[in-house]
């Protein structure tokens, strides 16, 4: 196997092994202590937006998020409350560092992106360093293919795509700087 391929494989493995350590940076700063929220009858979307106000984190909720909340939601931390709401209602979320995005699980999708001359390992490295990569949403690469497959909610896919476009602008002139997106679905 040529040295470049071995190096690329080792680099990708090192990045992927290190990704879980970044996971803490992908969560909002949950406030300490118990979080109490009383619901009489409220739209799920409104409760999530109110939750964001209560913890000082902007929350953007997709129009696909539907449902009503009733009754006692139990006590616990703000993180427990949020994760109980999202998992109990078929929702997924992504925190981009400033906004907490909440989507229906039905909105998850997969895109295959042609990187042109950008190396897949460079993409994974850049996304990890920027705090964009999220171990819950896979980025799959194959050395030498020039393609990556990205799965996740729409805000995550958009941020990955924006990063790739910015990286393509940094490729020296005269080189192939195309980034092609192939849309797909994970379900």
Residue ranges and their predicted role:
Residues 1-9:
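Bacterial N-terminal signal peptides that target proteins for export
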Residues 2, 22-187:
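Sec-dependent N-terminal signal peptides of Gram-negative outer-membrane/periplasmic proteins
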Residues 8-18:
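Bacterial N-terminal signal peptides
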